[in-house]
């Protein structure tokens, strides 16, 4: 057959046992992190009644993740990657235990939540970078595109399930249960990861880490195509930071604790559908234009989200944002792999991930600040429509990205 299917091809999970182990570990990890992602903002909102404080926690964690990604890129290129992955996961679990113990105190410490957020953000990003660096060795460079879509599906499905579980746990047992189960899940992920083969770094000349990073930055700034992709990715993650307003919007919509979980699950659900139906994305003749348009649509969805009179309609807007952002993100990933020289792939992937984290942190800080000056509804709408205006300007300015054309790859039987 030579007709390309809309559905994602999952054959890598059958043919590559090491990738299957990573798939399982990542799914458990995402569920665990989702429990954490619901608990932290709700706990801070309950303690402080301040959206600014909620945004600050996300910003601090994002800053720690950025540093961790930079350090992790250097470690992954110099040390055995399996050891880096295992060390990072185990250390994260210790931080989650700390959050659980803090939540059990008669008066939990807000400072402890912030400090443990820094701890977990830093060490979690070390593992992410090492896994990204190891993926070509696990699946083969020719399968990276398929592996990326499967990874997104894993992340999104886990992110759909965990917020709903987290919301139910909040309604029945409190945040300590969320933290405790997150710690347990993180340590469980070590079991499949222990089965990975040794993942030594590639041989390369010794270079000062800062010099290597600067070379990556220079390439990013000098390439209007790759640089434009990275810029869109940063803006897209800024829009996703709207989650810092969920607790306040939930009060506005008079949602129960269990219903709050649907807000956190909506974006991952839409993105999971986007990843599952991504079979034809790699065959788009004009991926740059499609990326720009899907990004604009996602900004519009966020702008409309806060204006919805009922929470269920807000969930629909968030799901639409998730679907459109998944389309844009998959196109970003694919074009970065194909348009970046092989010698730069590791650094550019690391910088792309880091700027996504930075965009999330900046977005959280801005939304937290807006939430202190405006109503939650006005804050959400202002962020979405503001990004939409910026996106329209980029549609006009990023000429090379908008006009980029590619020859659709040849389809094989396994693609159909």
UniProtKB/Swiss-Prot annotation:
SUPFAM superfamilies assigned to the protein according to its UniProt record, in alphabetical order: MFS general substrate transporter (SSF103473)
Keyword Cytoplasm: no
Membrane protein topology class: Multi-pass membrane protein
Periplasmic side: 43-55, 105-109, 178, 240-256, 308-313, 378
Pfam families in the record: MFS_3
Cellular component terms per the entry's GO annotation: plasma membrane
HAMAP family: MFS_EntS (MF_01436)
Function field: Component of an export pathway for enterobactin.
Protein name: Enterobactin exporter EntS
């Amino acid at each position: 057959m030579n007709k390309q299917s809309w559905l994602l091809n999952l054959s890598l999970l059958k043919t590559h046992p090491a990738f299957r182990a990573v798939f399982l570990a990542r799914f458990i990890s995402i569920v665990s992190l989702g429990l954490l992602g619901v608990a932290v903002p709700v706990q801070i909102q309950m303690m402080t009644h301040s959206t600014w404080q909620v945004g600050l926690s996300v910003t601090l964690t994002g800053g720690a993740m950025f540093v961790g990604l930079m350090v992790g890129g250097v470690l992954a290129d110099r040390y055995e990657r399996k050891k880096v992955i295992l060390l990072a996961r185990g250390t994260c679990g210790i931080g989650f235990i700390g959050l659980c113990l803090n939540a059990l105190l008669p008066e939990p410490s807000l400072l402890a939540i912030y400090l443990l957020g820094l701890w977990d953000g830093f060490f979690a990003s070390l593992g992410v970078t090492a896994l990204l660096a190891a993926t070509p060795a696990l699946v083969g460079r020719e399968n990276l595109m398929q592996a990326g879509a499967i990874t997104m599906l894993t992340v999104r499905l886990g992110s759909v399930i965990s917020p709903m579980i987290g919301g139910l746990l909040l309604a029945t047992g409190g945040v300590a249960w969320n933290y405790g189960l997150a710690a347990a899940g993180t340590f469980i992920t070590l079991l499949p990861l222990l089965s990975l083969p040794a993942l030594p770094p590639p041989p390369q000349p010794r270079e000062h880490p800062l010099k290597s990073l600067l070379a990556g930055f220079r390439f990013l700034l000098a390439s209007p195509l790759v640089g434009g992709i990275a810029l869109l990715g940063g803006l897209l993650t800024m829009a996703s930071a709207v989650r810092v307003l969920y607790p306040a919007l939930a009060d506005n919509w008079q949602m129960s604790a269990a219903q709050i979980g649907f807000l956190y699950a909506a974006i991952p659900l839409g993105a999971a559908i986007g990843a599952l139906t991504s079979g034809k994305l790699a065959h788009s003749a004009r991926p740059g234009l499609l990326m720009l348009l899907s990004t604009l649509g996602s900004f519009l969805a966020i702008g409309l989200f806060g204006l919805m009179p009922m929470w269920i309609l807000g969930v629909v807007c968030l799901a639409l944002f998730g679907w459109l952002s998944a389309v844009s993100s998959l196109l970003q990933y694919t074009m970065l792999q194909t348009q970046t020289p092989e010698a730069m792939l590791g650094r550019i992937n690391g910088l792309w991930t880091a700027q996504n984290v930075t965009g999330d942190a900046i977005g959280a800080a801005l939304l937290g600040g807006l939430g202190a000056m405006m109503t939650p509804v006005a804050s959400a709408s202002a962020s979405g429509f503001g990004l939409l205006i910026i996106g329209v300007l980029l549609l006009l300015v990023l000429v090379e990205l908008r006009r980029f054309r590619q020859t659709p790859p040849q389809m094989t039987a396994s693609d159909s």
